[in-house]
A protein has these predicted regions:
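Conserved acidic, metal-coordinating active-site core of Asp-based
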Residues: 102-216, 220-222
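Active-site metal-binding loops of divalent metal-dependent hydrolases
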Residues: 9, 44, 67, 217-219
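Asp-based phosphoryl-transfer active-site loop
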Residues: 3-17
Length: 222
């Protein structure tokens, strides 16, 4: 018997407008009424989930930032953070910069986004404190703070080729994935953490076994 449904958001449950369609929302509500727990599992940071809270009354959880954060939707608070150590991100950044010297690099904590390189703003910065700074300098100030996500964006490059080159360069230091269709944007984090890992830990803490979980998504980070 299924006790937990874990689903990606973008491209799976919601469209580009970040809205549930009535049929989808009705299905989720029916599952909850049947006693099934709903957990959203997304690459998005927790600060972007206000529209989800506004469309639902779920007193449940979301696994955010590719598994680095567990966020309680009902309480609107981050419960746990399992990010990457700053030294691993520093090593990865030192290796990637010479390979992609004109790229835009981004480093995220729960509430702050550090950016190195050109950017246009927009949704990626919504709800965050933004610091334009060379990332090695930013990492110098991390006194035990964990990196939620580290990203590299190389406009005009084929996403599959970019992912392969990044993985070849830093795959032994960090996890390497992507979550945006057709976009040359690679997401990196803790080598041992991903959506599946955090979901498994979450289910175990709630006494739910693997065969009682239904999970689905549409991108490599799923």
């Amino acid at each position: 018997m299924i006790r937990l449904i874990a689903s990606d958001l973008d491209g799976t449950l919601i469209g580009k407008d970040f809205r549930f369609r009535p049929r989808t929302l009705h299905a989720l509500q029916a599952a909850r009424a049947a006693g099934i727990q709903i957990v959203f599992v997304t690459g998005r940071p927790s600060r972007w989930l206000t529209p989800i809270r506004e469309q639902t009354d779920f007193d449940s959880y979301a696994i955010c930032s590719n598994g680095a954060v567990i966020y309680h939707l009902g309480a609107d608070e981050v419960e746990t953070v399992n990010g990457a150590p700053a030294h691993a991100i520093r090593s990865a950044h030192e290796l990637l910069q010479p390979v992609f010297p004109n790229a835009t690099y981004t480093l995220e904590t729960v509430d702050t986004v550090y950016i190195q390189g050109p950017y246009e703003g927009g949704e990626v910065l919504e709800g965050a404190r933004v610091v334009e700074q060379h990332l090695l300098g930013a990492l110098d100030g991390f006194a035990g703070e964990q990196v939620i996500k580290y990203l590299v964006h190389v406009p005009g490059m084929d996403p599959d080729i970019l992912q392969a080159r990044v993985a070849q360069t830093v795959g032994e230091l960090v996890s390497v994935t992507r979550g945006v269709v057709g976009e040359p944007l690679i997401e990196m984090g803790s080598k041992t953490v991903n959506k599946g890992y955090t979901l498994a830990q979450f289910a175990a803490r709630h006494g739910i076994e693997a065969h009682e979980v239904m999970a689905f998504g549409d991108m490599p980070n799923d």
